[in-house]
């Protein structure tokens, strides 16, 4: 495994892990994650693909409280890493990382042979965080990361209440969330700052696989459906029995879906 390093236009150091050889898969993790979020997925891919996994700047070690963060910054970071890679590049994103991937592709569609977007929480008809994001930010500022986590999972992600309480009752889980909380708040704010609507993607004529979990929250599936009728070359893949975190609950299933979509595009 190698590490790729480059510098963003504002001087921020960007890193990515580089495994395997073959056609290039470029993976962008979701909220509160990092390059290791894909650890369960890549063993099924690295024998046939070069797999590059970036760590998004707001979740990098020592990132602190992000200043003036936006999806434009995220997209530029994706493009900076993509510029280091041999083409063709098949771009994969999960959750807010899928939004960053989509925004990057919109800015430079020629850089990517295809897209694989797993439940991007795009504000298609409504904002993602809205009032709940303000409540989560307030709880975090008050020194209560557990309550901020509860609000995020219950009111923004919209997980079932009983599952949320189980997760919040786990001190290790709360500690992990607390370590990523500033980035997660900035992430949701950046999503909402995009504004409601997706008409701009009608011109993005790149083969796109939109992926949903059968058990995922309804709002994520609705947002995905809105993108499906907007993107010119979109098709939807449903992961049976899965929710919003198949990279953890069924990594081989997700890897198979990535492989199938990539081979369809890359040949």
Predicted feature descriptions by range:
Residues 55-60, 121, 240-242:
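Short beta-to-alpha linker loops that shape the active-site pocket of alpha/beta-hydrolase fold enzymes
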Residues 175-229, 235-238:
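Conserved serine/cysteine hydrolase catalytic core
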Residues 27-31, 95, 213:
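Glycine-rich His-Gly loop
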Residues 88-126:
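Conserved hydrolase catalytic core segment
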Residues 232-267:
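Catalytic active-site module of serine/aspartate enzymes centered on a nucleophile-bearing elbow/loop
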Residues 5-67, 87:
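Conserved HGGG/HGGXW glycine-rich cap/lid loop of the alpha/beta-hydrolase fold
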Residues 146-183:
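Conserved alpha/beta-hydrolase catalytic His-Asp/Glu region
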Residues 73-89:
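Conserved acidic catalytic loop of the alpha/beta-hydrolase fold
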């Amino acid at each position: 495994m190698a590490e790729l390093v480059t510098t963003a236009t504002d001087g921020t150091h960007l890193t990515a892990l580089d495994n395997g050889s073959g056609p290039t898969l470029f993976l962008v993790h979701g909220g509160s994650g990092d390059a290791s979020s894909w650890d369960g997925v890549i063993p099924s891919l690295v024998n046939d693909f070069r797999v590059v996994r970036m760590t998004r700047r707001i979740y990098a070690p020592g990132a602190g409280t992000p200043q003036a963060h936006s999806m434009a910054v995220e997209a530029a970071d994706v493009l900076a890493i993509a510029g280091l890679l041999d083409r063709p590049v098949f771009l994969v994103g999960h959750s807010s990382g899928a939004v960053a991937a989509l925004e990057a592709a919109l800015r430079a569609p020629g850089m990517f042979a295809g897209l694989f977007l797993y439940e991007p929480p795009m504000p298609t008809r409504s904002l993602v965080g809205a009032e709940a994001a303000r409540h989560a930010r307030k709880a975090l500022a008050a020194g209560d990361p557990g309550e901020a986590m509860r609000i995020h999972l219950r009111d923004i992600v919209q997980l079932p209440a009983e599952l949320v309480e189980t997760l919040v009752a786990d001190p290790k889980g709360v500690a992990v969330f607390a370590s990523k909380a500033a980035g997660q708040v900035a992430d949701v704010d950046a999503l909402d700052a995009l504004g409601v609507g997706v008409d701009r993607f009608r011109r993005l004529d790149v083969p796109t696989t939109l992926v949903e979990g059968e058990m995922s929250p309804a709002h994520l599936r609705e947002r995905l459906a809105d993108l499906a009728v907007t993107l010119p070359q979109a098709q939807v893949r449903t992961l049976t029995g899965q929710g919003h975190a198949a990279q953890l609950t069924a990594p081989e299933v997700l890897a198979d879906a990535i492989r199938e979509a990539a081979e369809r595009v890359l040949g």
